[in-house]
Amino acid sequence: MISGEMSRWTDAPRERTHALGLVFPPAGDHYTGMQLDFIGAIAETAQAYGYDVLLTTGSKAGDHPFQRLLAGRLVDGVILMEIQLDDDRADLLSELGIPYVLIGRARVEKTSWVNLDFAALGRDCVRHLADLGHRTIAFVNRSEHLFRSGYQSAHLGQEGFVRGVTELGLTGRTYLCDDDAAAGEACLERILLEDPATTAVVTMNEAGLGGLYRGLKRAGRAVPRDFSVVGVVAGPWAERVTPQLTAADMPAAEMSRVGVELMMERLKAPDAPPRHVLLRPLICTRDSTGPCKPVPGPDS
């Protein structure tokens, strides 16, 4: 439902504000390191085009921060992030005729977007581990809240993981994990409790990564001698853990740059066909994966 205030957005010519709205809700109680990387890169790229960036939250169309941004007519266009498969924020922007782009991908494609091929990356991580001899692998996803809300990367990444283990005849389990180190440690404990034969983890939860490592240390599993970890995270964060994480590095700077470029294109030619950019970075082999070492049995 469009309020009377917002319905007047395109009723009359408007002067350009030379500002972009960035609608980016934090993953949990605070922004993760990867999210902060995106915010900084988007602001830097927008500045190069002569635009300021107004950051606000709002994961749903009815959330007050999102409503205030639109009702105030403070921006020329909107960049949406933390995309859900069925994203009512995008639906509202389309209904209002407000130029917008996605960093992410919704189920219904109404505008330009840039995204990672999370499904393919999930499969790539499984193949990397399978090539090292791992047969029992766990997938550590994002939080239950994000998954149940339809968070697109969580769903696509898990679909790719499941497809990968199925195609290769491996044993795989999936786990939802809150975005913090304590949750990562608890998740790792649960993984080993439910299947002690697990020798590797694929993760998309960079905020829980330190906890996964801590849990492995507590369990007496050395990385990568006894246990391998591979993920999809931003490169700087993969390099901050010890041993450094083998990962498909999320190109936050490139995705941010492309997102702003797509926004500029929408502002210049709003009636042009939308453009879609799908990125699939290669796995960067660092120090957290190695050949599978069989898990000793209880009598060993």
List PLM regions with ranges.
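Alpha-helical recognition/docking segments in bacterial nutrient-uptake
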Residues: 2, 6-10, 14-127, 195
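Bacterial carbohydrate/catabolite-sensing allosteric modules
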Residues: 2-4, 40-49, 94-102, 106-300
